[in-house]
């Protein structure tokens, strides 16, 4: 049986996959699909986020071992999660069968100020330093990351619920960003 690990990005958690995780499982009924949270996010929101991508890889490997999920893995990863997936494949290639990387940028090739559009700096810095309501944060994230026409209220409502249940601290957001 193939095992697919889903990894999200900056301040996102497993629930941010929304319907995609279930659709992915439906498309691959013989596979095991695990949506994993990085430390500082989701069910692990109370933990400090590692300061390095290598630390995030170590945390993912430890969490999967704790759950009894054994390699080899296929990784489907987005943004920061794709950076984690790439490092994982580089440092433990015997554990990884393949990677699907979405919306990624790599720290060694582009510093954080190149990975984000300059016009979004002020909005993102405001979210980190003076977080507004969960609703305002998620609407801003939607506006900055989606080209879908108009807000998708159900998706944003799900994101708000996740942020309210398992808030990401400002310090963890910064630790993930730099």
Regions inferred by a protein language model and the residue ranges of each:
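Structural signature of beta-strand start/N-cap positions in the alpha/beta core
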Residues: 3, 32, 72-74, 95-98
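Active-site micro-motifs of SAM-dependent methyltransferase domains
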Residues: 12, 40, 82, 106-107
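Gly/Ala-rich beta-loop-alpha elbow adjacent to hydrolase catalytic centers
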Residues: 77-81, 85
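Flexible "cap/lid" loop of the alpha/beta hydrolase fold
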Residues: 90, 96-129
């Amino acid at each position: 049986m193939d095992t697919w690990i889903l990894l999200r990005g900056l301040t996102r958690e497993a629930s941010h996959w929304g319907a995609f995780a279930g659709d992915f499982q439906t498309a691959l009924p013989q596979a095991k699909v695990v949506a994993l949270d990085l430390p500082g996010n989701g069910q692990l929101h109370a933990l400090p986020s590692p300061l390095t991508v290598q630390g995030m890889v170590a945390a993912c490997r430890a969490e999967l071992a704790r759950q009894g999920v054994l390699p080899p893995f296929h990784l489907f990863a987005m943004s920061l999660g794709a950076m984690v997936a790439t490092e994982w494949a580089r440092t433990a290639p015997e554990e990884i069968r393949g990677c699907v990387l979405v919306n990624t940028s790599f720290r060694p090739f582009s510093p954080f100020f190149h990975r984000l559009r300059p016009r979004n700096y002020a909005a993102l810095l405001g979210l980190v330093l003076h977080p507004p309501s969960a609703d305002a944060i998620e609407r801003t994230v939607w506006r900055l990351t989606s080209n879908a026409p108009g807000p998708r209220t159900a998706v944003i409502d799900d994101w708000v619920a996740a942020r309210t249940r398992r808030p990401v601290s400002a310090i963890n957001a910064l630790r993930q960003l730099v």
